[in-house]
Amino acid sequence: ANGDFLEGHAVFDGQPLTIVGTTGHAPIGVRLALAQARVVLETVGAHPGRPIVLLIDTQGQQLRRHDELLGINRAMAHLGTCIDLARRRGHRVIGLVYDQALSGGFITSGLIADACYALPEAEIRVMRIPAMSRITKLPESLLNALSESNPVFAPGVGNYVAMGGVRGLWQGDLQAALRDALAHSPREDMRALDGAERGGRKLAAEVVQRVLAAG
């Protein structure tokens, strides 16, 4: 580790892997977004087809004027584009939320991987309920009530599994879990279908198919 930035290589079952991510609940600013993108691009250029494991522990995007002025939106979009490029070039990209995943720092990493997994004790949410209340103008009491029955409004790793955003939890033998993920994670986006099957997002897959059919 280099501060809050993780970068390295490993050999797993005789296969080299690229490891990249963050630690310490790192806020993702321009520096960290570009550093992760660099590792992904270097892997694509120098090691065709090598799997990439994204280790995710972030409090979300860096809320700082310095990063806003430097174009944090473009830096984070660049990171997401690099991960997408790696997938299109045949790299298996696996995300693992091992601690905390919030907001844009999660959207531009784990949610762009071939599949994202999590440890059972991980914390995942895109927006806190007080922030949802400010944005939607709905009272917190209503949002809290909705979160009891609707995974879309509720934080927690179990709700993201139900919605399909997290493909599954890694419990027990983590080596076996990684082995299975590298071998069986889908190349196509299965999140909407997983959400429908699990009851967390009942209409997303149907709406996607209607849009595709209309095109």
Regions found by a protein language model. Name each.
Residues 4-7, 137-143, 150-161, 168-215:
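N-terminal organellar transit peptides
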Residues 9-34:
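STAS-typified acidic loop motif
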Residues 15-20, 36-63:
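A structural preference for short, pocket-lining loop segments at secondary-structure junctions
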Residues 33-41, 76, 110:
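Short, hydrophobic/amphipathic alpha-helical packing segments
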Residues 40, 44-47, 83, 87, ...:
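Structural signal for hydrophobic packing residues in well-ordered secondary-structure cores
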Residues 60, 64-175:
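Conserved catalytic cores of soluble enzyme domains
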